[in-house]
Structures are given as C-alpha cells and as structure tokens.
C-alpha cells in the first residue's frame, strides 16, 4: 500500500494547486511513482483525460508534473457551475446531472464521497505516493459537516496534512492559528506542519513568528516559498498575471459562465489582454468570445446588455473577431439547444457561416488539425475539445486529422469575413500560429512584426519546482511519510 500526503490551505487562493504540482514533480524526480488526487473540485476550467472524460485543469497540470497521463481517477468529482446556484456534476469524467447546491449537499455528496475514497485507495494500492489537494479552507463552520474535500479525506486514509497560508495577502499567522483552533483534536493530530507561500522579503524576519507557531500549535514550519513569477495556468483567476501592454488592443468578453480562459495565457504574455463586460468598452483590434458553460444564456446576456451589437459594430469598423468553442457557436447563424438551456432555436450573432445543434453527448478529446484559414493555411495545430454541440459550416477553419492519436478527417470551425471560430481549446498555445496571426494584425496597423516567445508547461513546472525544492524541508516530509 502506498502513502498519501495532503496539502490543505487556510483559504481559497493560498496556492495549494501549484504547491501540489511542485511536490508531485519533486517526489517524481526522487524516483517515486507519484499521482495527484482531489476528491472534488469546482471549476469551469477543465481538460480531457486519457479515458476521454474531463478533469479540472489543476489535476491535469499535477498529472503532467508527475509525468503521468491525466486520468479521471485524479479528480473523481468535478462541479461545473451553471448559474442560479446550480452545477453540472461530472463523476469519473462524465456528466451525471445538474443539481442545485442544496440538493447536492443533502443528497449526492455522501454517495459520491464514498466512491471517491474507493478511487483514492485504489490509487494508493497502485502507486508509491498520492499527493492530495484540499479545497478552500478545512474549517468553514457552515460547510464542515458536508465537506468532502479536506479533513474527511485525510482521515479516510490517515494522510498527514501540510497547511498552506498565503503570506502575501497578510494575516497568515492568524489564519494558521485560527484554522488549528477550529480543527478537532483528531484533525490537528494529522497536521504535519505549515508552509508560508508567496513571500516577498527576508524570510529570517519571520523567525519570531515561527517560534510562536511552534510553541502555540506544536507543529513546525516546513518552509517559506517566495513569490514566484511563472506562466503556469491559474485555475480560477483572471487577475493573477502581471500587467502586460502591447501594441494591439486584444479584448476578451468576460461572459458570466466563461470557461477555459487558460486559452488566452499566450496572448497575455505576447501582447496583453483586457477582459470586458460593457458594450461601450468594445473596440479592440481583436475581440474574442471565449468558451462558456452555458452558451445560449451567455449569448442572451450579451444581447440584453448591448454587447452583441457592440461586437457587430466593432467588426464593421475593422475589428477581427474570434470565437472559441461556445464563443464560436454564438458567432454562428443559429443554435438549437434542447440540452443546456432548453430554449430551442436561438439566433446567433451571425458573423460566421455556421449552425450548431446541441446533443446529449459530450465530446472530450485531444485533437490535431490542419488550418484551412488562408493567412495560416497548412499550419498544424493541436489542442483539445470539450463540447456538447455539433456545428456545420461550408467554410471550416481547420480539418481535424487526429483524435486522441487515431487518424481522422473531420472539418471543424468556421471562417467568416475578418472572423473565425474553432472548437480547439489551446489554439493560441500553438506559438507559430499565434505569431502569424498577431503579426497579420500588426501589419494592418503598420507595425513591425514581432517574435512570440515560446515557452512550455514542462519548463515552467521545472522552474517553479526548483524554487519550492530549495524552500521546503522535503527531507522532513519524507521522514514523516516513512518513504
């Protein structure tokens, strides 16, 4: 039977996901067979698994850090918010229904938790070490009885817990002491120690605080991780990246149910982007309608708030418009939806010659494709799809040539006048394509071409991990785990 180690935080945004990824890579580099696990995650940013299901982007990244192919076992329960306090429940990579927060809490959680723990124990039998990520805070008093992502998981497999605090936001000592006070005696016994994350400054100045914590809580500080500049995807934050301002004005519509906004990280680093929510803001060189968990409702939101008309007007005046996944569907001529919104036929924005019909089957695949859009014709791109709609167009954007490694020939997307749409999430992570596209827009403004800097998730994981390895007492963790 393998070992389990759990990382919990004093709050949401403490940095658990990336610390787990770093620990996964550290122990993998030490020669251990490691996998990540999170019993339940709530996120609109998902990724395809090896089984053809979907998992959260955080566990996808952590799997890469373990040098493993992402599996639905790493994130058995995924909740995808739909609005109006409802979420789609994805179990083992497949949607099993849509429920209200109250109904899920009272009826579904207990059953799914038991199944998730079975998956965790299976992983422990198959691997040397499972590194588990918690969710939010483990001591939200109003939710603690229903919490299936924190201490209940640790207790189920007797996993030592590292408690992480974000010192950059302030109040971290109080957060740690308060969390420890609100844990039960049994739960406190599971806590191995503390990590202070995102520190800027001289860590030696924290020594009196560490001595106080050890005396008060009886647990050691295992490390102080400095604030690390990186390009790793942030699961649920649109504002974590430093400001970048380039020559092009790139705008992304911040839809109420925006999903997979990690698609736009390369554009951020290459030029800078703005997320917009008001019609009067829309006037960019490039306007992007992103993916959505509720395509029709977000289309109607744009229509009701004048954003649709603003996009059409900006396009008429020369803006280039792109739609990704749900955004592509919205930019087409019509959508027939009896699945997500059940609104039947809805007129699209009409900038792309495409029609979409929603079906009950979700496609979740890795794709490779050849671009047909003239400025990048013949370029090879890859990405992934997570969608329930089927779209047809006489002018496809690309031809899919590989689905999960199997040969294919399937047109996808659509091309319009100064517009295109595609189902390929991650299209802009194809740096040669992005460079070609941005330089086309720059040339139209009389600007010199630029080189888009290439970077890889693998390089970013290694860079981030090196800093964590130097900052955390890994030897103490190994000793406590008995590895």
Curated annotation (Swiss-Prot):
Gene3D superfamilies in the cross-refs: 3.40.50.880, P-loop containing nucleotide triphosphate hydrolases
Positions of the catalytic residues: 325 (nucleophile), 425
GO function terms (MF aspect): ABC-type vitamin B12 transporter activity; catalytic activity
Residue ranges of domain GATase cobBQ-type in the record: 247-433
Biological process terms in GO annotation: cobalamin biosynthetic process
Family annotation (PROSITE patterns): GATASE_COBBQ
Keywords: Cobalamin biosynthesis, Glutamine amidotransferase
Pathway(s): Cofactor biosynthesis; adenosylcobalamin biosynthesis
Signal peptide interval: none
HAMAP family xrefs: CobQ
Role according to the record: Catalyzes amidations at positions B, D, E, and G on adenosylcobyrinic A,C-diamide. NH(2) groups are provided by glutamine, and one molecule of ATP is hydrogenolyzed for each amidation.
UniProt record similarity statement: Belongs to the CobB/CobQ family. CobQ subfamily.
Protein name: Probable cobyric acid synthase
Organism from which the protein derives: Thermococcus kodakarensis (strain ATCC BAA-918 / JCM 12380 / KOD1)
